[in-house]
């Protein structure tokens, strides 16, 4: 960063790196700086945002960015994350709906132990807590 603080990819990569140290607000600052400097590639830079917001325990921010990603690049992971977000936010019925959709799309995941194998480490606690609240069985 010291060599080229105005390079968008450097800001993005630095933001990713400092998430490993729990510096989520600083990471967001660098990622949003990359987006501002290189708006044509914003979708590439935004993919990490749902994870950072979940890691922060910010359900509202996570929900915004999961919906954005789901609209742009549909994938089963987003149904699981929506289940976790809504579970943590207390909307258990909606969490259960998203969990059912996720499990239908991912038959290899039947319980918490299965999901722990694929959950992103950065936001594991938030996601697992939300999925438990949504009703993902322990075994």
List PLM regions with ranges:
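Alpha-helical protein-protein interaction modules
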Residues: 4-139
């Amino acid at each position: 960063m010291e060599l080229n603080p105005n390079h968008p990819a450097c800001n993005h990569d630095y933001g990713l790196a400092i998430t490993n140290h729990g510096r989520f607000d600083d990471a967001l600052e660098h990622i949003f700086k990359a987006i501002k400097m290189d708006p044509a590639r914003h979708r590439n830079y935004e993919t990490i945002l749902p994870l950072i917001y979940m890691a922060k325990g910010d359900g509202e921010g996570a929900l915004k960015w999961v919906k954005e990603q789901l609209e742009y690049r549909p994938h089963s992971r987003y149904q699981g994350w929506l289940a976790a977000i809504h579970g943590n936010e207390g909307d258990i019925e909606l969490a259960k709906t998203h969990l059912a959709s996720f499990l239908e799309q991912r038959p290899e995941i039947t319980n918490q132990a299965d999901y722990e194998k694929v959950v992103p480490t950065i936001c594991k606690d938030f996601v697992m807590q939300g999925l438990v609240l949504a009703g993902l069985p322990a075994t």
